[in-house]
């Protein structure tokens, strides 16, 4: 359940107010004045908490919960204990998130780790840097020459913003993050310990390894979120680009000249080699590695721990080592298991990776 030590929720809500906010139907309208003061998982919830149920795997938690109210689909509302108020809704998780965002705005984005409202005395800011009103700079942060930072942005403790970097409005740069050779849009969240804009890993071998100059930039568009420990190399001759609305998890490596489209999701510990391209709405599971110079088409999905050496067409699902269409990969796994058990049978036919029409 949520901790009031770190997160300060809004005042309590009635079930009628929650129903209106989440567009749910309160099955027993007579309970409309019943008060809820927080959110919790069903197994930890008490009489003042709101929970939600959507996955049949956790039906035992639903049947044993002590929650005061539960968001649930009509299909499962008969499994809700009598003491729990039922809020009927088409998508319980979406309704729950809507209410959570409403009462916990303080958890939506990092703020100053020191409760600061201005520039800390120990911060170092070059005289030529331009900070709009409302920028917060925590202790020991360093802001270099000709840096521009928009209103409402927060620069965490020990962060280093190098010469010429531009950061838009309502951004957050986490503690001990370094940013150089970068242009960053509005409402970008960069969590602690990230390194953005260092030179890419490019050498040629002529008796010794000779470094290739990296003279591009990093372009991060609006509404991007980058998790802790992620590194984004600047481009060599062209820019490294992260598209609008993309969300990147912790400890991801983005190589030089990479182009990531809009609204992609990249899970932890992925490695994106130089000069590859992700289209829009691409999803990568954890620990995916992608070869350089390949193209992952719009809407493609790659399963966790896959190694991708070839381009993936738009809309397809690939996985494995080396990655291939997932249904082909699964059939090959089954065939190998049968061989290990001494079974017989023809090898499965190849698959194009496209979902079959079930209509």
UniProtKB/Swiss-Prot annotation:
Pfam families tied to this protein: Hexapep, LpxD
Pathway as given in its UniProt record: Bacterial outer membrane biogenesis; LPS lipid A biosynthesis
GO annotation, biological process: lipid A biosynthetic process
Superkingdom of source: Bacteria
InterPro entries the UniProt entry points to: Hexapep, Hexapep_transf_CS, LpxD, Trimer_LpxA-like_sf, UDP_GlcNAc_AcTrfase_non-rep
This protein's GO CC annotations: membrane
EC number(s) stated in the UniProt entry for this protein: 2.3.1.191
GO function term, MF aspect, one: N-acyltransferase activity
Record bears the keyword Lipid metabolism: yes
Active-site residues annotated for this sequence: 256 (proton acceptor)
PROSITE patterns, A to Z: HEXAPEP_TRANSFERASES
Top EC group: transferase
Record's catalysed reaction(s): a UDP-3-O-[(3R)-3-hydroxyacyl]-alpha-D-glucosamine + a (3R)-hydroxyacyl-[ACP] = a UDP-2-N,3-O-bis[(3R)-3-hydroxyacyl]-alpha-D-glucosamine + holo-[ACP] + H(+)
NCBIfam families listed in its UniProt record: lipid_A_lpxD, PRK00892.1
Function: Catalyzes the N-acylation of UDP-3-O-acylglucosamine using 3-hydroxyacyl-ACP as the acyl donor. Is involved in the biosynthesis of lipid A, a phosphorylated glycolipid that anchors the lipopolysaccharide to the outer membrane of the cell.
Assembly notes: Homotrimer.
HAMAP family on file: LpxD
Record family assignment: Belongs to the transferase hexapeptide repeat family. LpxD subfamily.
Protein name per its UniProtKB record: UDP-3-O-acylglucosamine N-acyltransferase
UniProt organism field: Rhodopseudomonas palustris (strain HaA2)
Protein encoded by which gene: lpxD
């Amino acid at each position: 359940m949520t901790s009031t030590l770190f997160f300060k929720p809004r005042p309590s809500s009635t079930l009628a107010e929650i129903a209106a906010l989440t567009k749910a139907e309160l099955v027993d309208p007579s309970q409309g004045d019943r008060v809820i003061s927080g959110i919790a998982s069903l197994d930890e919830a008490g009489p003042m908490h709101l929970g939600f149920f959507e996955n049949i795997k956790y039906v035992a938690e639903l049947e044993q919960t002590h929650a005061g109210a539960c968001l649930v689909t009509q299909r499962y509302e008969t499994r809700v204990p009598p003491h729990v108020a039922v809020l009927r809704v088409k998508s319980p998780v979406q309704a729950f998130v809507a209410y959570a965002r409403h009462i916990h705005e303080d958890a939506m984005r990092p703020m100053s780790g020191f409760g600061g409202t201005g520039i800390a005395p120990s911060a170092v800011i070059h005289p030529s840097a331009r900070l709009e009103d409302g920028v917060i700079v925590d202790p020991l942060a360093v802001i270099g020459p000709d840096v521009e930072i928009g209103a409402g942005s927060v620069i965490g403790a020990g962060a280093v913003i190098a010469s010429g970097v531009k950061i838009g409005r309502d951004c957050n740069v986490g503690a001990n993050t370094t940013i150089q050779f970068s242009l960053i849009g509005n409402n970008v969240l960069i969590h602690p310990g990230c390194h953005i804009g260092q030179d890419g890993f490019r050498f040629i071998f002529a008796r010794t390894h000779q470094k290739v100059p990296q003279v591009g930039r990093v372009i991060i568009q609006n509404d991007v979120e980058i998790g802790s420990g992620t590194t984004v190399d600047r481009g060599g001759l062209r820019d490294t680009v992260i598209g609008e609305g993309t969300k990147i998890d912790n400890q991801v490596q983005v190589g030089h000249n990479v182009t990531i489209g809009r609204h992609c999701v990249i899970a932890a510990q992925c490695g994106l080699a130089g000069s590859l391209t992700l289209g829009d709405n691409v999803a990568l599971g954890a620990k995916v590695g992608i070869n350089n110079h390949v193209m992952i088409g719009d809407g493609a999905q790659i399963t966790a721990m896959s190694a991708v050496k070839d381009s993936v067409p738009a809309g397809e699902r690939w996985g494995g080592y080396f990655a291939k269409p997932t249904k082909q990969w699964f059939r090959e796994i089954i065939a190998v298991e049968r061989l290990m058990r001494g079974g017989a049978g023809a090898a499965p036919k190849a698959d194009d990776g496209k979902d079959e029409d079930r209509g």
